[in-house]
Swiss-Prot record:
Belongs to the UPF0216 family. InterPro entries: UPF0216. This is UPF0216 protein MK1676. Transmembrane segments: none annotated. Pfam families: DUF61.
Amino acid sequence: MRDESRLDKYVIKEILRINRHLPRRRKTLEELLREERPHVVNRDGTKHYFDRDELERLADILPRYLHGRLKLPILIELGYSGAAVIRGKAEVRVVCEVLGEEWRFSQDRVELNMLDVRKLRREFPTATQYMFSTEYIMGRPKVERRG
């Protein structure tokens, strides 16, 4: 295991700063549908509100038993490779349905090109958010530190 360089540490710190708009805790579709004004609290203390029509469309796409598993907002992970990644079984299922892609039961990750990302964001602007990933910073997987 090699030590991270100063540049790597700086870049990771900046990416974490850029991601302040992300929620402290994502909520399930089930939780959000019960709220009068569906929202999550972001890391920077602001609130991100969801459009109820988007939530209803997601509820129509996804079988009811998965409403408690779909975590929102769906995070569109942007990383070093230039591709976007969506993670999570329920999240991937929704994205595949929206994009007309084949979905497999065991699938918990999907890579998207930027045209697909644009379509997804146009369909669900409040139910999706960009996340800048540190996982493949500088073209290599992030090293997990154990303390």
